[in-house]
């Protein structure tokens, strides 16, 4: 009686072995793949071992966390045929060795898990199929497609009396995974303090406990320093720079004169403003990153570099944003040079303004490359603008139906960015218009009371002659 359980156990093991022999032997494994770059050819290998007769091999694309399996390729051993289920992909995959699928140009959308299912016939009956499967994760990388450096909160005015914070934004798009972004100044990496939140706009100059290193010996222009201090002395003595009240008799240096754009414009005065304060230490930089996923699976990275701007040191400084990414063979880079506006070029149309014309005065560039984008303010020296306003913000000043009274009037254009400010003065010469009798227009360029009375008399004369 005691031997009965042992006998039954032996019989069960024997039957299991017989069933295994009947079903056949089948194991499946897929070789792991390192991350691949979009556009490369990828081969998914499904290795299997069996002593049975193969029925089919099916590849699946797994989506939605494994809840959906999309059949992408099938090899039917019964009919020795294979066909694609990826109609939307226009049969991009090829079955190389019955157990291998090749994607000639992998895409970011191909990223994700895949499964290979292999089926063999049961040896006991051909109506049953024994299945085994393996899985692999295809990690598709994509290098960044664009990089750009811009200034935040621009255009912005130049601060003459106090320091202000300045932020450069490096925008990197199209990368997967997110790239590493960092800044350099004049070719040297910037040791920045990481920030998780943006600094408050009203927090004042940014500070850090780390020791400062002086930059005066490296970047400060003694000429700029002396001129800045001379302007400060003039202000303390009660005087003002001539650029704020230009004189009609002033003859500026011909080297800085702009070419006149209309006839008989006698002078164009260019000035440059400098700050009334000077820093003597290297600024502390603060760096903050943000990441925004895109619908195509890539990530947009924004790196924000903030520091307390010092125009004496930062003007003409070269800042570069560099990107490192596993899909790039070398870093990606974008550069900007911080430059204050200098020597605005003014174009006036028409070239010969007459009474009643609409005159346009446009800033048509600078003598240098300016960054960040400047803001423009127009004023009329000694009076208000034609429309009665004190000033106008914009790149182009439009004077509609100019009257003769504007002949000889001077206009000031102030171009400024956080690095500095420059003033340009130009004089408007208005010529007589033979189509408009002298004295018949008012200050707005329209027909005045005298012209109206003359028109009325002529009309009455014509009516009387007709009657």
UniProtKB/Swiss-Prot annotation:
Where are the annotated glycans? 82, 165, 407, 444
Q: Where in the cell is it found?
A: Postsynaptic cell membrane
* Cysteines paired by S-S bonds: 46-116
**Effect on the protein of changing residue 467 to M:** In a colorectal cancer sample; somatic mutation
Record SUPFAM superfamilies: Immunoglobulin (SSF48726)
Give the PROSITE patterns listed for this entry.
IG_LIKE (PS50835)
What Pfam families does the annotation carry?
A: V-set
* Free-text domain note: Ig-like 1 domain is indispensable for synaptogenic activity whereas Ig-like 2 domain is secondarily responsible for the activity.
What name does the UniProt record give this protein? Immunoglobulin superfamily member 21
Q: Which organism is it from?
A: Homo sapiens
Q: Which gene encodes it?
A: IGSF21
